[in-house]
Amino acid sequence: MSNCILSRPCSYAIRAMVHLAEQPPGRFSSSREICDQEDIPPSFLGKVFLPLCRNRMLRSLRGIGGGYELAVPPDQIRLLSIVQAIDGSQLDDCVLEDHACGNPRQCLLHPGWAAVREQFLNYLESTTVADLVRMRKSAHLTIPAGGDTPEVIPSTK
């Protein structure tokens, strides 16, 4: 496991989904627009959008005027769904090893990690993309790559 709970692609996916949620209904956003406005490397966008399309969270349209839009309202997309689509079972990984904890006695940190993991899963399950849009509007938060703590950027609006 990396030094972050969520992978960099997962962080990019969440940022892109928030961007799409901020668009008017029916408006498709191009890959270039999303990458430019959310500071996402273009090489990552297709990789993170494919599983989101497969999981019916995103819709894509090819051609002129095409791009991506949310397939369901943002208040129906839980962060846990995005994380599971992108990172799979990574949250089951031990904080000390690159694999899932199999025996709680093997890892002295297991009981503490299990409690933290449960709280984090509850947060991901109870938080929607719409919630992040509201948070970003109220504090103008940016969601950094690599899953670091969100940064507060003073709003210029």
Identify the meaning behind each predicted range.
Residues 1-6:
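Short, Lys/Arg-enriched N-terminal segment that forms or immediately precedes the first helix
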Residues 8, 73-98, 113-118:
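Conserved segment of winged-helix/HTH DNA-binding domains
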Residues 8, 12-40:
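N-terminal helix-turn-helix DNA-binding core of bacterial DNA-binding proteins
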Residues 41, 71:
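Helix-turn-helix DNA-binding motif, specifically the short coil turn and the N-cap/start of the second
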Residues 44:
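Residues in the helix-turn-helix
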Residues 48-53:
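Basic amphipathic alpha-helical segments that dock to polyanions
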Residues 57-70:
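Beta-hairpin "wing" of winged helix-turn-helix
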Residues 98-157:
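C-terminal regulatory/oligomerization modules of transcriptional regulators
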